């Protein structure tokens, strides 16, 4: 009996520790921060998986053609070689790299470069676009699903699908499996990205906390895109193809387990929390003119980045005889102005929240000017400055308009955010689905200069459209159905809705300050007539 006493004490101590940790995890403020960490890790993983294949797939597909597996190592033989990738950008690898790379070799073991053929370039472009294409197709379904199921279960589903996709990448031996894994990642992203951003908007309902939290999420997205290519390239060369994907799979699994511990999505309390009001249907949100303006801005501002990534390397080689390291480094400095743009917009939004539309319009103008300047650059340094301006403008637009979407849902619809952020994800996916496939054809038929000028002009022309959002900050926040049901007797809800509608029709006071798209029937929650 004596040995059981220490065992019992250990169990009691473990139980107390578990209860203490559980209580700490359930403390509202701490739980909100943990949820932000979980979502940021999920977004980081998604973007790392999106970009980690940049240095791996072209060489791997070329090795499939050659009949060998993994990177070819050459010992004690000097050969011109591509340096390890150092940036979050697919251009240096997606473009046709048939010209000889600049030699900076050594006599040590190095990764022998294998350049994709023209048909393999098409395969690589389709592979990169497949993720965004499937994401584009699934988002109209994932948004309403998130509205109905709350945010934690779809986020868990997304992390699980991303885990499966990453494992498939690790063990893929042919192009079909790579394509299936890439497409599966798009399915996971449609759930994880949308539910994650929606969860942040739900957990941080007030400004400036909401803008700050969404800004942190955007910084993690940018960092994931930056760190993934060198992470993948170094591990691929020294540890093999499977290792970078298995590391990402392990982090994805850990994030899912942390979500289970913090949110407890299958508990009775979680099911009670999931009893949300019925969200506005996604097709009705798409018809909301304010939301349509924001979605158009998100698509327009991301088109230059999505179209320049797969084309700028070839243009640099032909225009300025750029070396491989220059093509690899050209996007790296842009991370700093992107984070600076996020920080600046968050600080400005905290002091002047009614000017979010202006920050977005300035961002579009900066993107437009930067895109138009790119073809005029004839050396490396001016090109870096132009691309830094491009990413700075994208940060302004994203950081200003993502919180605006949540605010529009709060004041014009029901405060359920799955569908509206599915629309935002659709906006991004349109650009990144077209970029890897269409950009090269436009360059071949019209030229790189015309492509850049066209994208810049589109952003400059769209900037004044955001003037239509200038009165959004003056709208009165509506009370959600959940709040009404808590504060009002059930029999009075219908009467309150009818009274408000009658006042509007009889020429009573308007529901909110007038705007170009305003009507009283739109300023009250759509659920009253669903």
UniProtKB/Swiss-Prot annotation:
Electrogenic antiporter that exchanges one cholinergic neurotransmitter, acetylcholine or choline, with two intravesicular protons across the membrane of synaptic vesicles. Uses the electrochemical proton gradient established by the V-type proton-pump ATPase to store neurotransmitters inside the vesicles prior to their release via exocytosis. Determines cholinergic vesicular quantal size at presynaptic nerve terminals in developing neuro-muscular junctions with an impact on motor neuron differentiation and innervation pattern. Belongs to the major facilitator superfamily. Vesicular transporter family. Glycans are attached at residues 89, 96. Residues 471-530 are annotated as: Mediates interaction with SEC14L1. It is found in: Cytoplasmic vesicle, Secretory vesicle, Synaptic vesicle membrane. Interacts with SEC14L1. This is Vesicular acetylcholine transporter. Residues 1-33, 147-152, 204-213, 264-289, 347-356, 410-422, 469-530 are cytoplasmic. It is a multi-pass membrane protein. Residues 55-125, 174-182, 235-242, 311-325, 378-388, 444-447 are lumenal, vesicle. Residues 504-530 are annotated as: Disordered. Pfam families: MFS_1. One of its GO terms (molecular function) is monoamine:proton antiporter activity.
């Amino acid at each position: 009996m004596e040995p059981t006493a220490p065992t019992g004490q250990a169990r009691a101590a473990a139980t107390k520790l578990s209860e203490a940790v559980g209580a700490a995890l359930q403390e509202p403020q701490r739980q909100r921060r943990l949820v932000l960490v979980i979502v940021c890790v999920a977004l980081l993983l998604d973007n790392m998986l999106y970009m980690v294949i940049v240095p791996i797939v072209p060489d791997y597909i070329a090795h499939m053609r050659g009949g060998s597996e993994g990177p070819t190592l050459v010992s004690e033989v000097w050969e011109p070689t591509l340096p390890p990738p150092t940036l979050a950008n697919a251009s240096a690898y997606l473009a046709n790299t048939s010209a000889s790379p600049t030699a900076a070799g050594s006599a040590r073991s190095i990764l022998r470069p294998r350049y994709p053929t023209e048909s393999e370039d098409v395969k690589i472009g389709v592979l990169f676009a497949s993720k965004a294409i499937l994401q584009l197709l699934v988002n109209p379904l994932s948004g309403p699903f998130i509205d109905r199921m709350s945010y934690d279960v779809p986020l868990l589903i997304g992390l699980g699908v991303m885990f499966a996709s990453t494992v498939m990448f690790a063990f893929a031996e042919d192009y079909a499996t790579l394509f299936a894994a890439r497409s599966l990642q798009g399915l996971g992203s449609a759930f994880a990205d949308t539910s994650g951003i929606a969860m942040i908007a739900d957990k941080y309902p007030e400004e400036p906390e909401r803008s700050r939290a969404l800004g942190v999420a955007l910084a993690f997205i940018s960092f994931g895109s930056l760190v993934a290519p060198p992470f993948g390239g170094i591990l691929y060369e020294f540890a093999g193809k499977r290792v970078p994907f298995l590391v990402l799979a392990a982090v994805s699994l850990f994030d899912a387990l942390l979500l289970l511990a913090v949110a407890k999505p299958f508990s009775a309390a979680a099911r009670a929390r999931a009893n949300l009001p019925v969200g506005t249907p996604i097709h009705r949100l798409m018809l909301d003119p304010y939301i349509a303006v924001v979605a158009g801005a998100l698509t327009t501002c991301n088109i230059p980045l999505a179209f320049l990534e797969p084309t700028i390397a070839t243009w640099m080689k032909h225009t300025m005889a750029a070396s491989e390291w220059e093509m690899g480094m050209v996007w790296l400095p842009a991370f700093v102005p992107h984070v600076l743009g996020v920080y600046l917009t968050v600080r400005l939004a905290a002091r002047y929240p009614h000017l979010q539309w202006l920050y977005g319009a300035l961002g579009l103008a900066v993107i437009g000017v930067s895109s138009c300047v790119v073809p005029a650059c004839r050396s490396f340094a001016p090109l870096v400055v132009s691309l830094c301006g491009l990413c700075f403008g994208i940060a302004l637009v994203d950081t200003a308009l993502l919180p605006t979407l949540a605010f529009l849902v709060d004041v014009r619809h029901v405060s359920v955010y799955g569908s509206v952020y599915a629309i935002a994800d659709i906006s991004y996916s349109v650009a990144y689905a077209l970029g890897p496939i269409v950009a090269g054809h436009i360059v071949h038929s019209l030229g790189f200069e015309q492509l850049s000028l066209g994208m810049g002009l589109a952003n400059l022309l769209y900037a004044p459209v955001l003037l239509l959002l200038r009165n959004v900050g003056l709208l009165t926040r509506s009370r959600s159905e959940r709040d009404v049901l808590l504060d009002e007797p059930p029999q009075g809800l219908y009467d309150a809705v009818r009274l408000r509608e009658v006042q509007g029709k009889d020429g009573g006071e308007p529901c909110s300050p007038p705007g170009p798209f305003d009507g009283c029937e739109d300023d009250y929650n759509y659920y009253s007539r669903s």
